[in-house]
């Protein structure tokens, strides 16, 4: 991965790691507390719908979009358009080998940009090299820990608010990069 990073630096490209994840209505149970003899209980219903989120992590910022259902090639192209519009500079997008990332629709979109967005793939089975994975860990194990929404709309709204709070906290973004041991 060092070669794409060096080339990006030479060409003045901004490096953006991209990844997708799902957030379930089912709570991520972490540490709980209750007085001795009283078992802590998290009440939830058994209709475990989910919200999908796609995020791009730069050295200083996190850009994201939430979707109901799975993220498909169309949502990936929409996200790449948003990245291009928001970041302006030429980009090096680094992501995993998800089939949708290699789809014809995504390739055609990228080919039509005249090289404004270039792509590099992470090695197979190397999620620990992607700093966005650590953003997901923070979101699920800290920001949404033990959170039990009443419905999908509430989950969507809360996840959006938590990710917006991460955008305003540079230490969270920096910690994701440190955890991935990239800088």
Can you say where each PLM-predicted feature lies in the sequence?
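Short functional hotspots at interaction and active-site rims
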Residues: 1-183
């Amino acid at each position: 991965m060092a070669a794409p990073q060096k080339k990006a630096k030479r060409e003045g490209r901004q490096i953006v790691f991209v990844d997708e994840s799902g957030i379930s209505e089912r709570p991520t149970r972490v540490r709980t507390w209750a007085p001795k003899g009283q078992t802590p209980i998290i009440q939830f219903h058994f209709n475990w719908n989910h919200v999908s989120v796609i995020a791009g992590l730069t050295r200083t910022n996190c850009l994201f979009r939430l979707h109901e259902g799975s993220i498909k090639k169309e949502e990936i192209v929409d996200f790449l358009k948003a990245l291009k519009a928001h970041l302006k500079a030429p980009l090096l997008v680094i992501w995993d080998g998800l089939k949708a990332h290699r789809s014809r629709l995504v390739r055609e979109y990228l080919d039509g940009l005249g090289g404004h967005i270039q792509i590099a793939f992470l090695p197979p089975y190397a999620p620990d090299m992607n700093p966005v994975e650590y953003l997901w860990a923070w979101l699920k194990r800290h920001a949404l820990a033990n959170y039990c929404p009443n419905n999908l709309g509430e989950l969507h709204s809360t996840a959006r608010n938590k990710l917006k709070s991460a955008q305003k906290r540079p230490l969270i973004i920096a910690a994701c990069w440190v955890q991935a041991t990239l800088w």
